C-alpha cells in the first residue's frame, strides 16, 4: 500500500470512528522509512535451521528477512549481525530478540527465553562489535503463550536501560 494511500485510509477510518469529533488531516512524514527505534524478532528452529525475523500474518510461522525498511538502520545492522552469529545451540533456549536504538545513539539488546548460558558468547561479540551497545539483558520467559516478556531480567552487560532524549529531557 502506497504511503499517501495509507494516510488517506487511516484518516477516513478515524473520521468514521469519531463522527462527532472534528478530525484533522494526518500529517505524514517526509521520509516514511527507517524510523522505528524498537524491534522484536521471534526466534525459532525449523528443519535444523535458525529462523529469525517476523511472524507471517495470522500464524506462528517465522519469515526470515535481511532488513526491515521501517526499522532504524542501526537496528537492522544489529539484527543482521545476530542472524549471522546465532547458532542452533544459542537459539534453542530463545524465543525473541528485542532491539532498541535511542536518539542518543545507545543500543539495547534483550534476549528473551529460558536460559542465558548459551547467549554469553554472542553477548560478548555484540559488545565488542558495536561500541554504542550500552545494555545487553536476558529476560526469562518460560511461558507457552504469546506474551513476549517475562517478569525476571538479568543484565549481561552495561545497564538495564538506555537513555532517550525527548524535548530536551533525558529519560531511561
Which functions belong to the PLM regions below?
Residues 1-172:
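Accessory RNA-recognition modules of RNA-modification enzymes
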Amino acid at each position: 500500500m502506497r504511503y499517501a494511500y495509507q494516510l488517506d485510509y487511516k484518516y477516513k477510518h478515524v473520521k468514521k470512528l469519531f463522527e462527532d469529533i472534528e478530525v484533522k488531516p494526518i500529517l505524514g512524514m517526509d521520509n516514511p522509512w527507517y524510523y522505528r527505534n524498537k524491534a522484536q524478532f521471534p526466534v525459532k528452529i525449523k528443519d535444523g535451521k535458525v529462523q529469525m525475523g517476523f511472524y507471517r500474518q495470522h500464524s506462528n510461522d517465522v519469515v526470515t528477512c535481511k532488513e526491515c525498511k521501517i526499522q532504524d538502520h542501526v537496528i537492522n545492522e544489529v539484527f543482521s549481525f545476530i542472524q549471522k552469529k546465532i547458532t542452533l545451540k544459542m537459539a534453542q533456549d530463545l524465543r525473541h530478540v528485542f532491539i532498541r536504538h535511542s536518539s542518543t545513539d545507545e543500543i539495547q539488546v534483550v534476549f528473551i527465553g529460558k536460559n542465558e548460558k548459551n547467549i554469553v558468547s554472542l553477548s560478548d561479540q555484540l559488545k565488542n562489535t558495536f561500541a554504542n551497545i550500552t545494555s545487553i539483558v536476558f529476560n526469562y520467559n518460560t511461558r507457552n503463550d504469546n506474551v513476549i516478556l517475562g517478569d525476571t531480567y538479568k543484565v549481561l552487560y552495561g545497564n538495564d536501560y538506555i537513555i532517550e532524549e525527548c524535548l530536551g529531557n533525558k529519560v531511561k
